[in-house]
């Protein structure tokens, strides 16, 4: 199938992916631009997984103030080099992550950061709710698993649907940027403050403490 220059240009404007990658994705998708976007995202996530072992020791701390000064966020996002940290794509990513935290109020960076105590407390609540249905224990555990998956989406930054594009998670957003920039990127920690709240949300990723990367597996 012949792919026109206009199609390639359109896809590049939508994704910021290299021209050659856009053409290959369009060819694979038989000219369907929406399918080509999906293909590019999947390749970006796969690329992120390959880079997941690389150490991220550069990056930046970004602030975001929202709602007339009532909500504030500080977030540290790391990458491999100062060169990437200065790129517009990285700056846009960090701004979007900070804005997302302000709007969505996550409690943890990754689901692996959820403490055992916090996790068990939620599981017990879901078990009690499911037990009232009178269903057998194996079915109840399946129900609990499903509710925990939803729970992670609600409280873990990387699992949450991205506030500006609900069809992808924040983790997938980061993975796509990794694919574009060619370096591993990880969220190390964040703090969220809201006027009137007692205390603040402070989250530090265990992965960052242990020198691991945060790229999610391809779905």
Curated annotation (Swiss-Prot):
InterPro entries: EF-Ts_dimer_sf, Transl_elong_EFTs/EF1B, Transl_elong_EFTs/EF1B_dimer, UBA-like_sf
A GO cellular-component term linked to this record: cytoplasm
Region (Involved in Mg(2+) ion dislocation from EF-Tu): 81-84
Sorted UniProt keywords: Cytoplasm, Elongation factor, Protein biosynthesis
Major site of localization recorded for this protein: cytoplasm
Disulfide pattern: none
GO molecular function: translation elongation factor activity
UniProt-listed SUPFAM superfamilies: Elongation factor Ts (EF-Ts), dimerisation domain, UBA-like
Compartment(s): Cytoplasm
Signal peptide start and end residues: none
Matches recorded under NCBIfam families: tsf
PANTHER family, sorted: ELONGATION FACTOR TS, ELONGATION FACTOR TS, MITOCHONDRIAL
Similarity-based family: Belongs to the EF-Ts family.
Protein function: Associates with the EF-Tu.GDP complex and induces the exchange of GDP to GTP. It remains bound to the aminoacyl-tRNA.EF-Tu.GTP complex up to the GTP hydrolysis stage on the ribosome.
HAMAP family reported for this sequence: EF_Ts
Name of the protein this chain belongs to: Elongation factor Ts
Lineage: Bacteria, Pseudomonadati, Acidobacteriota, Terriglobia, Terriglobales
Gene: tsf
